[in-house]
Amino acid sequence: MAAKDVKFGNDARVKMLRGVNVLADAVKVTLGPKGRNVVLDKSFGAPTITKDGVSVAREIELEDKFENMGAQMVKEVASKANDAAGDGTTTATVLAQAIITEGLKAVAAGMNPMDLKRGIDKAVVAAVEELKALSVPCSDSKAIAQVGTISANSDETVGKLIAEAMEKVGKEGVITVEEGTGLQDELDVVEGMQFDRGYLSPYFINKPETGAVELESPFILLADKKISNIREMLPVLEAVAKAGKPLLIIAEDVEGEALATLVVNTMRGIVKVAAVKAPGFGDRRKAMLQDIAILTGGTVISEEIGMELEKATLEDLGQAKRVVINKDTTTIIDGVGDESAIQGRVGQIRQQIEEATSDYDREKLQERVAKLAGGVAVIKVGAATEVEMKEKKARVEDALHATRAAVEEGVVAGGGVALVRVAAKLTELTGQNEDQNVGIKVALRAMEAPLRQIVSNAGEEPSVVANNVKAGDGNYGYNAATEEYGNMIDMGILDPTKVTRSALQYASSVAGLMITTECMVTDLPKEDKADLGAAGMGGMGGMGGMM
């Protein structure tokens, strides 16, 4: 086992604080509308330019192992805030640095670290409740656009694009961000349920100008099996032909004689048919077939539950207003499924999301919810160069997370004002002893740090602005972009409650642990023995005299 280097008490805390400050100082230059960019060197390719706190934090590794431990613990704050709300990483880092700095001063002055931590925890619990009380719902497109704009570093086009996407696919819809091909940002919206399977034969195409199959008010047959024998399908085909409607077949596969017969029938105009493979594989395919069945009011024909294709009737088939199939995708628009059944299915999938352990599973389940509940929107980010594209894409993703958080828990006044108001309301809060009271004061003082940093980045004097904001009340604050005072919500400067809450909770959690640190242990650097061995070989030169 390698030898260890151990530091105690103030020596350990000073080193740890130095690491915290290096990381936090690098991250906090990005905060606010006048925050600056950070350039990150990559081992290959062009450097990355970013204004995203967590991206900066992830790149930082320090040479001194004790300092690095401090930096890594604050990096955890940024990562956790990012995982919980998708934004607010810089705010969380600034709060953590402020709590640690003030807390360690109190420890150096002889306060009990454990009581300090209890005081900080008590203040944060009370602050979270006050934040919830200040929160207002974020329901209209204007508010959503404002949240998106603020999070995308005051880029109004991004805010409007996200608001438009949310309006079109609903709050539950999936919105994804991709790299575009042009200079302009674009929004593509897919209404209804779309899955990545195209037609099984190009002979099904009935719109040659677009290369697509379009079926109006079709019946939809769902089969969890391979169909190769046409005899199994004859009863259903005859019933559909009598009804005079088109038919979409979604099955594990349609092949051989069955596919050939369907193609011939379609080309002769006897019955309008199209066939596609079911989406997904294994259990996921079964689940997605069931989703389509509920959306279209049909039944999955499956031998597992004793159903046979020959005995299927029109009652077993789903229906939709329209189906569009191209080479790679199938879109079912306006399924006739029962609304309460669809909501029940959505609730069931949400339960699975709660229990999912892997991010991949969670993402796939969320896609299924979106396909049932709304639709899918794709924001294609446009930029002149690849470096700008990456930076802009990261900003759009941040803005998207922030707007989702705003819809979920509402919004509070932005620009660090909400935390200042919360701190003002908690001045009467007390702990069980004097050390806990100091802990409460440490937390309340730290809540001013985001406002001060935003002002500092804008080139103004933080103390003057902080005092002016504290003298006001409600949503009165300082707009660093225009250098004006006023009502933050009226000026469109909003922060999602969830983002502010998460930043405060994660910052205080890690900062509290760091304040109570008394000893740090790390590996001693290893000496390079190979060099010593090589140097020792020099004596071999004397062997020449042995002759």
Curated annotation (Swiss-Prot):
Sorted UniProt keywords: ATP-binding, Chaperone, Cytoplasm, Isomerase, Nucleotide-binding
Family: Belongs to the chaperonin (HSP60) family.
Domain of life: Bacteria
EC number: 5.6.1.7
A biological-process GO annotation: protein refolding
Subcellular location: Cytoplasm
Keyword Lipoprotein attributed: no
UniProt cross-references to PROSITE patterns, sorted A to Z: CHAPERONINS_CPN60
InterPro entries in alphabetical order: Chaperonin_Cpn60_CS, Cpn60/GroEL, Cpn60/GroEL/TCP-1, GroEL-like_apical_dom_sf, GROEL-like_equatorial_sf, TCP-1-like_intermed_sf
Keyword Isomerase: yes
GO MF assignments: ATP binding; ATP-dependent protein folding chaperone; isomerase activity; unfolded protein binding
PANTHER family: 60 KDA HEAT SHOCK PROTEIN, MITOCHONDRIAL
GO cellular component assignments: cytoplasm
Binding annotation for ATP: 30-33, 51, 87-91, 415, 479-481, 495
Alphabetized Pfam families for the sequence: Cpn60_TCP1
Reaction(s) catalysed by this chain's protein: ATP + H2O + a folded polypeptide = ADP + phosphate + an unfolded polypeptide
Function: Together with its co-chaperonin GroES, plays an essential role in assisting protein folding. The GroEL-GroES system forms a nano-cage that allows encapsulation of the non-native substrate proteins and provides a physical environment optimized to promote and accelerate protein folding.
Subunit structure as annotated in this protein's UniProt entry: Forms a cylinder of 14 subunits composed of two heptameric rings stacked back-to-back. Interacts with the co-chaperonin GroES.
Predominant location category: cytoplasm
Protein name: Chaperonin GroEL
